[in-house]
Structures are given as structure tokens and as C-alpha cells.
A protein has these predicted regions:
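N-terminal amphipathic/basic leader segments beginning at the initiator methionine
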Residues: 1-53
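N-terminal active-site beta-alpha-beta segment that forms phosphate/nucleotide-binding
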Residues: 63-125, 373-388, 393-394, 399-414, ...
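Well-ordered mid-protein domain cores that form the structural environment of catalytic cofactors
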Residues: 93-172
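Conserved, well-structured core segments that form the ligand-binding/active-site neighborhood
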Residues: 142-346, 353-356, 376-381, 387-389
Length: 513
């Protein structure tokens, strides 16, 4: 049985602790009395995955078995989570591949011939052929790509269906083929509690016309937690749930397949990162020293290649299928067993190490706006009831925050950074003054549809994602961050951890740089 997570209180015996810092890492001493949150150990991975998949399809929650829903002559569409999850990408075979092979084989046996597959990339960049192949596997790729396996196109008016409005006036528009199908199967990987459920179809297969109703400043500021989909807790999930209700009321039949992963994130030679520091063996201590030395001395381009090529050995901990709500309830229960840690009381300062990866820079670059999304956005919001830091407290992040952008993937990010953030960092002002122009710009739309660029509006959403955190926090300081870049973001930069902690808490002593 996996050990539960716990909160370590730093004392004289506590060794330096591992901290991520972009495409780097370090061991850091923390002040006495600091509390360090450790997640539960990795849950045991499921063995014989194909058997578990078949069992989930044959014994779904709140639905007939999938075989009973598949009939000759029907129109079947399968939507698949895109490259934004899991993080890092899985080692082959990806769980999506195994699920798809079982679903498609079952459909063939039931006489279903009209089958289309879509990567549910919403306003994310299109996946390349190699990226799609890694997710779905060689067999599915060769059978369907490119005619019947495609990226969803949120700007293709010929393949979008306007469905209606929610009782809150939110417009619902999704992939036309999906809406007109006799059955839509959604294949999901649930990395965190924000994923899955009704956030899958109404977001993954939607257009900007629809997404803008929940990816906005008002929604972000009125969410108590992005990671708590209980009604009334997350405005974005409440909106997606209303949209899901509209889709079902208009005849869309969805069979949801959700999967969960354990915490076995990093492969060798970085497997020591999966363990608590005081439990490192002598070999793992030596591996840390060698890996850090090589990483620190290597050219930046080489380091980037090493990190972006990492494939995670994470194991599958759950496979659930059936009705979306019934499935997601089971999914969240498994996620919580793997991720929840009880923390007693809030702190003055929250410290996080930002890793090299987030949902929007897979095979790409972590640009400054994505640093903002990952820090005050995702990591600040990794709580269920209350933030771990008090209102008005400080957030300290470790990251170099270089002024670097992927010119193909993030063109509108560059322009937002250079044009918009030089004028204002206020999310509401940015939204009202600039969003529509970027969202409807013909060049950005062309790059989204024909190249591999994120939609022109996407960096705005990444900026809004940090709105709740910045509204709540009193200070954000980045250790090792580029001063000019941090200033553009509205942060403070510090050269060392000792300096930054003394700035926000002068009484702190006994700390190393």
C-alpha cells in the first residue's frame, strides 16, 4: 500500500531539498520551521492494461456497455486528449493508444465503418504527425491518418456546429462532426482535478466563440480553486457543466473514457527526483551530482534537447468508462488518493520550483507568459479548500525566466509580451482593450490553422490564468529570474534565496543561498 503524503517541518536534521528551476535543478536549504509538502507515494500501476480497458468498456458507470452502443451504419466520432497532457509525455505505449486500439477493434467487430478521430486540441497548436503517432500508436495512425484522424480546427466554419446557449447566455459551439454523430467517445488522461469531466468536450472540441465564455478574467477571479470542480467552487467548471448540459439536451450522446496516472514521473537518470531526499541511496546521490554537473555545464541548446526528450514511466492507476458525470466521480476519487495532502493552516510565504514543462510547451519553450501561467496560475491553485499561503502573502518561485519564445508555436505570445505587457499587466484592461483584436487577427488564425501556432488569443488566457493568484497574493518574487523579464511581468527578481526571504521576512535566519 502506498504511503500517504505528509508535511515535513524543517529542523536541524533536514537535508537540502530538491527544487526545480526550469531546465535545471538544485538542492536548497530552507529555514527552520518551514513546512514542505510531500505527495503520497506512487499508487501501484495497473497490470494487464488491455484487460482493464476491456472491463471498463464492458462494465461502464451509468451507461450500457460500449458494445451495445455500437451498431452497423452508425456515425462514430472519437475525440482524444491532445499533447498538453500527460506531463511529461508517456513512454510508449501511451494509454490513449491502448484504449483506442480496443475501442476501434470493438467497433469493427460490431460493424461500424464510419469512424473519424479528432485530437481535441481546442485553441492549442496543432499536433505534428509524429506527435499524433506517439499518442495513438502506429497501428491507429497508419489506419486513419490523415484523412480520418485530424486535429480539431476551432476556426473551420464548415466543421463547427452552433448548438445553443446555456441559461447564463453562454454560446455553445463545437466540432460539427462530433455533434452530428450517433455516438461521441472521448478518450481522456486526467493529470489533475481540473481535467476531464465536462471540461473535455465543451472545451477540447470548441471554438473561440464558445471558449471565451469561461476562459476570461471574471471566471478566473470567481473561482475559489481551479482544481476543485465541485459546484460553486470553480466558475470555469460550472460553465463547462452548463455547456455539457446543453450538448446533451440537444442530442449529443457521449461515452467517456477517463484514465489516471501515478507519481512515477521521471525516468533514469532523473529517477531520484521521484523520491524523498533523505531516502536517496548512495547511487542516487551520485547520480544527482553527476546529472547536475552535466546539466549545469552543458550548452543551453543541448540541455533543452535532453529535457524535451524525456518520456515519463508513469503507470496507469485507473480506467473508468461510461456516463461523463459518473465516470468523473470515480476518476477524482483515484486522483485524490494519489495527490491530496492535508495541510494544517496557511503560511506567510509559498515557495515553488517551476519545472521545465507545462501543458503548453511540450516539445517547445517555456516562455515568460507560460512561467506566469504555471506559477501564479497552476501551482498557486493546487489546492482544494484554501491556498497554502495566507491572503496578501508572498509567492517565491525558482526559474530563470529567460526572454525566449518559440517563434512557430507562440507567435502571438511574443506580440503580447512586447506590445501589451509594456502598457499594462492588469488582466481586465488587457482583456477589454486587446483580446478581441488578437483573437480575430487573420494572420494569427492562419498560423493556427495551417502552421503549428497556438491560437492568437491563447496567451491572453495564460495571463488570465494567473489573475486569481495575483489578486490574492501580495508579492511574487523569482529566484534567479532575469530582472528585465520579471519586471515586465510585474514580478521582483532576486539573485539568491537568502536575499528574497530576507526581503519578505527579515526575521528569517539560518538559510543558505
Amino acid at each position: 500500500m502506498a504511503r500517504p503524503g505528509f508535511v515535513l517541518e524543517v529542523d536541524e536534521r533536514t537535508p537540502p531539498l530538491l527544487v526545480h528551476q526550469g531546465e535545471g535543478f538544485r538542492l536548497q536549504k530552507f529555514p527552520l520551521g518551514s513546512r514542505v509538502i510531500y505527495p503520497p507515494d506512487s499508487l501501484p500501476k495497473l497490470r494487464w492494461l488491455r484487460n482493464h480497458i476491456r472491463d471498463a468498456l464492458d462494465h461502464p458507470h451509468g451507461s450500457e456497455p460500449l458494445r451495445e452502443l455500437l451498431t452497423p451504419g452508425m456515425k462514430l466520432t472519437i475525440a482524444i486528449d491532445d499533447i498538453s497532457i500527460p506531463l511529461p509525455p508517456m513512454q510508449s505505449p501511451d494509454i490513449r493508444q491502448l484504449v483506442l486500439e480496443e475501442v476501434i477493434e470493438l467497433a469493427a467487430r460490431r460493424g461500424v465503418e464510419d469512424v473519424k478521430l479528432y485530437m481535441a486540441n481546442s485553441l492549442h497548436r496543432r499536433m505534428t504527425a509524429d506527435e499524433i503517432k506517439h499518442a495513438v500508436g502506429e497501428r491507429v495512425f497508419r489506419s486513419f491518418y490523415p484523412k480520418d484522424l485530424k486535429n480539431h480546427d476551432a476556426e473551420d466554419p464548415e466543421n463547427l456546429a452552433y448548438v445553443g446557449k446555456t441559461d447564463q447566455g453562454e454560446e455553445v459551439e463545437i466540432n460539427k462532426r462530433a455533434m452530428e454523430s450517433d455516438l461521441l467517445i472521448y478518450v481522456n488522461i486526467n493529470l489533475v482535478a481540473m481535467d476531464g469531466g465536462h471540461k473535455s468536450v465543451p472545451v477540447g472540441l470548441a471554438s473561440y466563440r464558445s471558449v471565451k465564455h469561461h476562459h476570461n478574467v471574471h471566471t478566473m477571479l470567481h473561482s475559489k480553486s481551479y482544481m476543485d470542480p465541485r459546484p460553486g467552487r470553480s466558475a470555469i467548471h460550472d460553465s463547462c457543466r452548463r455547456m455539457g448540459d446543453v450538448l446533451m439536451a440537444n442530442g449529443l450522446k457521449v461515452f467517456t473514457i477517463e484514465t489516471t496516472m501515478n507519481n512515477n514521473t521521471f525516468p533514469d537518470p532523473f529517477a531520484f527526483m521521484n523520491k524523498r531526499e533523505w531516502e536517496w541511496s548512495l547511487v542516487e546521490q551520485g547520480t544527482y551530482l553527476a546529472a547536475k554537473k552535466a546539466n549545469d555545464m552543458g550548452p543551453s541548446a543541448m540541455k533543452h534537447q535532453i529535457w524535451t526528450r524525456i518520456k515519463s514511466p508513469a503507470g496507469v492507476t485507473g480506467i473508468v468508462a461510461g456516463d461523463t458525470d459518473a465516470v468523473h466521480e470515480q476518476t477524482l476519487a483515484t486522483l485524490h488518493r494519489q495527490q491530496l495532502v492535508e495541510v494544517d493552516g496557511q503560511s506567510d510565504i509559498m515557495v515553488v520550483g517551476l519545472p521545465y514543462i507545462c501543458p503548453y510547451n511540450v516539445n517547445s519553450i517555456m516562455n515568460p507568459i507560460l512561467v506566469h501561467c504555471l506559477g501564479p496560475g497552476y501551482l498557486f491553485n493546487l489546492y482544494r479548500n484554501k491556498p497554502v499561503v495566507r491572503p496578501g502573502g508572498a509567492m517565491i518561485m525558482f526559474h530563470p525566466v529567460p526572454n525566449e519564445f518559440h517563434q512557430v508555436h507562440h507567435p502571438s505570445y511574443v506580440d503580447l509580451f512586447e506590445e501589451v505587457l509594456t502598457e499594462t499587466t492588469d488582466p481586465s484592461t488587457i482583456e477589454s482593450k486587446y483580446e478581441e483584436r488578437y483573437a480575430t487577427d487573420p494572420w494569427y488564425i492562419h498560423l493556427y490553422r495551417k502552421s503549428y501556432a497556438y491560437h492568437g488569443v491563447h496567451p491572453f488566457y495564460m495571463w488570465y490564468w494567473g489573475a486569481h493568484g495575483l489578486d490574492y497574493l501580495g508579492d511574487v518574487i523569482v529566484v534567479g529570474g532575469d530582472p528585465k523579464t520579471c519586471d515586465r511581468l510585474g514580478y521582483r527578481a532576486a539573485s539568491s534565496f537568502r536575499d528574497v526571504v530576507k526581503k519578505v521576512s527579515p526575521a528569517v535566519v539560518n538559510i543558505e543561498a
